Amino acid sequence: MPQLTRSAELFEKAKQFIPGGVNSPVRAFKSVGGTPIYMAKGQGAYMTDVDGNTYLDYVGSWGPFILGSMHPRITAALEHTLTKIGTSFGTPIEMEIEIAELLCQIVPSIEMVRMVNSGTEATMSAVRLARGYTSRDKIIKFEGCYHGHGDSFLIKAGSGALTLGAPDSPGVTKGTANDTLNAKYNDIESVRLLVNENKGNIAAIIIEPVAGNTGVIPAKPGFLQALRDLCTEEGIVLIFDEVMCGFRVALGGAQERYGVTPDLTTMGKIIGGGLPVGAFGGKREIMERIAPLGDVYQAGTLSGNPLALTAGLETLKILRDENPYPELERKAAFLEEGFRNNMNKLGLNYVQNRVGSMACLFFTETPVTDYDTAVTADLKKYGTYYHAMLDQGIYLAPSQFEAMFTSAVMTDEDLEKTVKANYVALQATQK
């Protein structure tokens, strides 16, 4: 068990000044118990905490670090921008055009794009745009999907909201809640029912094409295409929230992997290379409704700042030029097979879901295809498993309902170490 004396001291101090001691709820370890770990440094696939313990990192800053931490090309580019260019001007810069052009080239749905500062900003802006474009009010989301902490999305939400047992949040007005309808993930009939009950009133359907905030839940074959067809028939804007799976499951995201093109796409995490960046983009005729060209207002003081765009642009260029995706697939498949073999040896039948380098081990024997099946997972067993992995230097998300991310810089030795640790941790769940 790692010694966490300094982390414990810092957490006690933080609770005096920061609500719950953290700036994002899942970091407080409420789901798994124990002391939140304060990190001091990241390098490649590893992190070191303030007590000197080192961990193999499968959280990757909650997804952005597909290339690991402190990638030399990204670090060098940031140093150049910081010392030779500046951090922010509040004016247009040439780099904005460069990253926008690149996004239009690599993401199938994007003809125009607007940069923002977070995934939450991207999803909030995309929904507002869809409402303005269609002159309709209601949206359909899916139970357990998480689209940031905007009011419209905190109704049967995933991620930290689900982790803390509060998928619905106080502070969301009844009017807002009434305009958000929830369908069952992977159930097209539940969507059709809502559309028929609200004929002509649905502005958008927003979905994670790979649900990554209820653990990891892949879309069933044909489900995304059925949504695409329904939205086309009904004049509804289809929004793919690719904040997590964008640039992760393929260079062009889940829409490239599955061959289904939405009307709008929201992006975050990897697009910022570890700095706060988001974006939303899509069809030109829809995007042209955004101010100053159109009448749908959206703005941001630090949107498109050179420091954040440097990290994002360099990350995207590396992904485009080096194409790590086949190797990421191999590495993630190695872990999946290793975990399965371990469970077979121990007579266990827990569920593994994986899409590319996003994966989740659910502590349930029920196939996980939606919110209802995800919450059958045994959270106490996950907590035991989590700490048993942590004791062996493997850092996972402190929540059953988050993804495990494989990074391109992980070595075969790292993967073998993880499989061995998994066996020991699975044994611990049987005690």
UniProtKB/Swiss-Prot annotation:
Chief place of localization: cytoplasm
Positions where N6-(pyridoxal phosphate)lysine occurs in the chain: 269
CC cofactor: pyridoxal 5'-phosphate
Transmembrane segments: none
InterPro entries: 4pyrrol_synth_GluAld_NH2Trfase, Aminotrans_3, Aminotrans_3_PPA_site, PyrdxlP-dep_Trfase, PyrdxlP-dep_Trfase_major, PyrdxlP-dep_Trfase_small
Gene3D superfamilies: Aspartate Aminotransferase, domain 1, Type I PLP-dependent aspartate aminotransferase-like (Major domain)
Compartmental location: Cytoplasm
UniProt pathway annotation: Porphyrin-containing compound metabolism; protoporphyrin-IX biosynthesis; 5-aminolevulinate from L-glutamyl-tRNA(Glu): step 2/2; Porphyrin-containing compound metabolism; chlorophyll biosynthesis
Keyword hit for Lyase: no
Keywords, comma-separated and alphabetical: Chlorophyll biosynthesis, Cytoplasm, Isomerase, Porphyrin biosynthesis, Pyridoxal phosphate
An example molecular function term from Gene Ontology annotations: pyridoxal phosphate binding
Origin: domain of life: Bacteria
Listed EC numbers: 5.4.3.8
Any one GO CC term of the record: cytoplasm
Keyword Isomerase: yes
Reactions that this protein is recorded to catalyse: (S)-4-amino-5-oxopentanoate = 5-aminolevulinate
Family designation: Belongs to the class-III pyridoxal-phosphate-dependent aminotransferase family. HemL subfamily.
HAMAP family reported for this sequence: HemL_aminotrans_3 (MF_00375)
Assembly: Homodimer.
PANTHER family noted in UniProt: GLUTAMATE-1-SEMIALDEHYDE 2,1-AMINOMUTASE, GLUTAMATE-1-SEMIALDEHYDE 2,1-AMINOMUTASE 1, CHLOROPLASTIC-RELATED
UniProt-recorded name of the protein: Glutamate-1-semialdehyde 2,1-aminomutase
